[in-house]
Amino acid sequence: MGSSSKEETASDGDTASGGASPSNDGRLFSEGERVLAYHGPRVYGAKVQKVELRKKEWKYFVHYLGWNKNWDEWVSADRLLKHTEENLVKQKALDKKQGVEKGTKSGRSAQTKTRSSADTKADKDDTKTNAAKGKKRKHESGNEKDNVTAEKLMKIQIPASLKKQLTDDWEYIAQKDKVVKLPRSPNVDEILSKYLEFKTKKDGMVTDSVAEILKGIRSYFDKALPVMLLYKKERRQYQESIVDDTSPSTVYGAEHLLRLFVKLPDLFSYVNMEEETWSRMQQTLSDFLKFIQKNQSTFLLPSAYDSDKVSDGKGKGKDD
């Protein structure tokens, strides 16, 4: 997914430019400037790499510190904050509100939180701190040398045809003003079940590790979708479609599942596991992507997209 194929996914909340003062030509931020950037409902450390005037509005190409470059994107000034102590406090408050501040969750929190460091130094320090903690735990169990982080090992190769799908997905939503019709069929749960059936027929059985990885994909998808897998104009549709205890994996399909795979290396960046475990997981994820590619004509269809119409009791509402 190229840098040009990214829609602005700003939060609908408070998105002021954080006390920025315009330059003589109206720019609020400059190339090379370290900033804080909204992505979904949270704020992340970022760096402005390019600045361009587009349709009488300044746009800023940002790189989220510690994230894969596939998530670099063009944003408006209302997505950015100056890197100040005041705004760092705001960042921490938003993180706490979303339940991702360190120590607010036990057990699974290390596997589900995303990187939210304000700058490169903090990013590196956090990584070192977590790695040190992981090594300490492994040392106590006698397996320190086998302990590695996903950041070093997790490399998911997305097939070319699926990369094109990700680009097409962006174009449908950002340029053609469409959204994926919900509920999708097959949905994520059904796709995972179909893969399980496929593996059973192919190999005669499915190992416990494969089954656990598939359960993990479902869990990550349900947690990640509302905070990092939706474009801005998809949010009202999400609010209308996911009610009560409905799981996103029973409503959304392969289009949104592919977005998760782009994000997985970052989601796994704090997880410490034995190298053999990571290797097995990477192999399963790659095989699963090949399965989606093989069934692309069934799972991923242009007809799955429809115009984003104003809610009239029949269609989904447009997030203006």
Curated annotation (Swiss-Prot):
Record localization:
Nucleus
GO molecular function terms listed in the Swiss-Prot or TrEMBL record: methylated histone binding; promoter-specific chromatin binding
- CDD domains per the record? CBD_MSL3_like
Provide ranges: composition bias, Polar residues: 12-24, 106-115
What if the gene is knocked out?
A: No visible phenotype, due to the redundancy with MRG2. Mrg1 and mrg2 double mutants are late-flowering under long-day growth conditions.
Outline the extent of the Tudor-knot domain: 30-80
Main subcellular localisation: nucleus
Keyword tags: Chromatin regulator, Nucleus, Transcription, Transcription regulation
**Compositionally biased, Basic and acidic residues: which spans?**
93-104, 116-128
Record note on quaternary structure: Interacts with HAM1 and HAM2. Interacts (via MRG domain) with CO. Component of the NuA4 histone acetyltransferase complex.
Q: What is this protein called?
A: Protein MRG1
Organism of provenance? Arabidopsis thaliana (Mouse-ear cress)
